[in-house]
Swiss-Prot record:
Organism listed in the record: Euglena longa
UniProt family annotation: Belongs to the universal ribosomal protein uL2 family.
Top-level taxon of origin: Eukaryota
Complexes and interactors: Part of the 50S ribosomal subunit.
GO CC terms in record: mitochondrial large ribosomal subunit; plastid
A GO biological process held by the record: mitochondrial translation
Protein name: Large ribosomal subunit protein uL2c
UniProt xrefs under InterPro entries: NA-bd_OB-fold, Rib_uL2_dom2, Ribosomal_uL2, Ribosomal_uL2_bac/org-type, Ribosomal_uL2_C, Ribosomal_uL2_CS, Ribosomal_uL2_dom3, Ribosomal_uL2_RNA-bd_dom
Alphabetical list of Pfam families matching this protein: Ribosomal_L2, Ribosomal_L2_C
Main location per the UniProt record: plastid
Protein's UniProt keywords contain Plastid: yes
GO molecular function: RNA binding; structural constituent of ribosome; transferase activity
Keyword tags: Plastid, Ribonucleoprotein, Ribosomal protein
Residues in the signal sequence: none
Lineage, uppermost ranks: Eukaryota, Discoba, Euglenozoa, Euglenida, Spirocuta
Length: 274
């Protein structure tokens, strides 16, 4: 994937760059593998805003991604690499030998014509899925399950990967994308390889409107508000926040405060925090 840079013809194109979508299929979405999903736009079930910086954006159809690779011992062939507006990675359309078509997250270096399989004992090739207990140490994996049978949750964004560090009788030590080291059950499934589309993080939006197309609302600084709206607000001119540490709009510590519950049951599975 190559990043294409625009000429500075207008202020909006001065620093703008886009993926050139080379290798991405031009075909229309598959109706049987896509559906409309109501987007919450930062609201909860009562309609109250819980995320102030979400809303708007272009209409999207959600693609049915096979996070749970349950087509065991059946070979699949990659038909095409497609764009998915709902995620940073690309998706690969796979047709299995029984005729079923499904989408999976495209790993790095997975190209059209490659064959993949989900099995307990298979080769360590890009795109193959198997339990982490059968994956060699040091292997890069993605789409890793937190709990057996729940489908992949870990390392699904563009360029993300986890690494198998150590193995025990019932658990496997995993290096998370955040830098955290965590134990997961050895019966959890994972897919071999790193997620593709590494150039996603090199793209510069170039203008505020392009961010609005993605459904992101502007984020207003607290120091630009009034005292009644934010703890950082008020003051004469460009004044400091007037606090010993930055605070959220609701008066809680904004930076460095641990937010994980100290008695959460899964704390015992975290070997080292990020």
């Amino acid at each position: 994937m190559v990043v294409r840079i625009y000429n500075p013809c207008t202020p909006g194109t001065r620093h703008r760059s886009v993926n050139d979508f080379s290798g991405v299929a031009n075909s229309k979405y598959r109706k049987n593998l896509s559906f409309f999903l109501h987007r919450s736009k930062g609201r909860n079930n009562r309609g109250v805003i819980t995320n102030r910086n979400l809303g708007g954006g272009h209409k999207r159809l959600f693609r049915k991604i096979e996070f749970k690779r349950d087509k065991f011992s059946i070979f699949g062939k990659v038909l095409s690499i497609e764009y998915d507006p709902n995620r940073s990675s690309r998706i690969a359309l796979v047709i299995y030998s029984d005729g079923i078509k499904r989408y999976i997250i495209q790993p790095l270096n997975l190209v059209i014509g490659n064959k993949i399989i989900s099995d307990f004992h298979t080769t360590i090739d890009i795109g193959n899925a198997l339990p982490v207990n059968f994956i060699p140490l040091g292997t890069l994996v993605h789409n890793v399950e937190f709990k057996p049978g729940n489908g992949g949750k870990i390392a699904r964004a563009a360029g993300a990967f986890s690494k198998i560090i150590a193995k025990d009788k019932n658990f496997v030590s995993l290096s998370m994308p955040s830098g955290e080291t965590r134990l997961i059950e050895n019966s959890c499934w994972a897919t071999i390889g790193q997620v593709g589309n590494l150039d996603f993080y090199n793209v510069i939006l170039g203008k505020a409107g392009r961010n609005r197309w993605l459904g992101n609302n502007p984020s207003v600084r607290g120091i630009a508000m009034n005292p009644c709206d934010h703890p950082h607000g008020g003051g004469e001119g460009r004044s400091p926040i007037g606090r010993s540490k930055p605070l959220t709009p609701w008066g809680k510590i904004a930076l460095g405060k641990r937010t994980r519950k100290p008695k959460r049951y899964s704390n015992k599975y975290i070997l080292s925090r990020k």
